[in-house]
Amino acid sequence: MGPPLAQELTQACNQPLAATSNLQPDDGYKIELRAENTVDKYPAKQHARRVAAQIRQGKGLIFLMGQKSTLHEDSDQERSLRQRRYFFYLSGVDEADCDLTYDIKTDKLTLYVPDFDLRRAIWMGPTLERKAALQKFDVDEVNYHSSLDEDVKKWAKNQDPGSTIYLLHGSQGPAENPPNVIIDSKALKLAMDACRVIKDEHEIQLIRRANDISAAAHLEILRGITSMSNESHIEGSFLNTCVSLGAHNQAYQIIAASGSNAATLHYSKNNEPLKGRQFVCLDAGAEWNCYASDVTRTFPITHQWPSIEAKQIYQLVQEMQESCIALVKEGVRYLDLHFLAHNILIKGFLTLGIFKGGTLDEVKKSGASLLFFPHGLGHHIGLEVHDVSPQSIMAQGINDDSNNKLILPTCVSPCTTSSPALTSGMVITIEPGIYFSQLALDNAKPEQLKYIDMARVKNYMAVGGVRIEDDILVTKTGHENLTKVPKGDDMLEIIRQGKKGNDSHHV
């Protein structure tokens, strides 16, 4: 790895997170992460104003419920808290049993925290106090939960008949709906989705930190992979690094898929031996202050390419990804990048002899490439790993007849219907992949099989699957890659050097 990227990585990871962890400086990837969050208050009030502007009403009350403390079924053990993301967006509060209201007309954001419970405090520690919460969070007032219903009634009495209370869901409202108000459970979600898709600087910094921690964890695995013998060792190492650096939650379930397991897109058993397998596909991303990272690297269990076929497929996926990333900027239609990735795959497979007997357009129209690349190029990322948007970045335009076969339901998940251009402030993933799935091939359609040389495919089945994924910030002039994990030959060099010197975490 040359000095420029090594320096960039060091700079990105040296932003203050406190509690230093110095991971393997010998290979040029010196990462110093500190676990203390020194970023300013989460901008909840700014978010509330943005949402109100999207609702386009000069008055009304936004009412949002946070996640409640709950027990596992038939158990006295509490479930781990996962805060409701819409609530977090307007509060910055990652604690259970809180609610909020925002009076649009008076611009007043009020947080409601649990009433003091002595027994719970003795067992679990004290809950938020009003004064401490007011200092910690970007809100105008903090009240105890016992006053919430009465406060809503008082608000309603002071409003004109027909005033609106905005809810995320009809089931998440006040205990009693005041008789003189309208309950709207549609407008709020649409408004919040429109706001959440464009990240402000504070949100970008949180996603950046999540990526920096994920980078440290991925690098630690590359340095130690030659001493690991099971997928579970990879998962354990990733979790250990993340938790040591203050990231106690993962943005999604870790995928540590070796060999043919990598052909299963969301494989999660992570319990099989690595011996005799060519590649590991590691899809794993830490969460920081409720914001996700989503990072995938595919690598061999030794410091060299395990076969010529493995090298060919890896380099083809890397070309797909880097070609698409290079074109990311404001105004680009994301779906066109998805089509570009398929075009590169088809050209590559024609060259390798995996596809035969047709032109690029003929193969594309048959849908043959979908057998090997069966998902969309990527998605938004933010408070959810598949973040929300009022419109899908993967939806079909009106003049895409020649590409119809390349659009599957998975391409638009989890969003909805139409496709706008990329906009500055969006954070998206670029994650092409090539998979050799026996299940997919066994269920191929005749028009797809027409262009596939199955004898040639057999030579590639042991590759399993290759996916490479980075998180990309869209800017006015282009993009910024937030993911600082090596690929290709740089990746192999990290594996070759392995662990040198002191590999402990100083946290």
Curated annotation (Swiss-Prot):
What exactly does this protein do? Answer: Catalyzes the removal of a penultimate prolyl residue from the N-termini of peptides.
List, separated by semicolons, the cofactors it needs. Answer: Mn(2+)
Q: Which InterPro entries match?
A: Aminopep_P_N, Creatin/AminoP/Spt16_N, Creatinase/aminopeptidase-like, Pept_M24, Peptidase_M24B_aminopep-P_CS, X-Pro_dipept-like
Q: What class of enzyme is it?
A: hydrolase
What SMART domains does this protein's entry cite? AMP_N
GO MF entries: manganese ion binding; metalloaminopeptidase activity
Show the taxonomic lineage.
Eukaryota, Fungi, Dikarya, Ascomycota, Pezizomycotina
**Name of the protein:** Probable Xaa-Pro aminopeptidase HCBG_01484
So what does this thing catalyse? Release of any N-terminal amino acid, including proline, that is linked to proline, even from a dipeptide or tripeptide
Cofactor details (free text): Binds 2 manganese ions per subunit.
Q: Which PROSITE patterns match?
A: PROLINE_PEPTIDASE
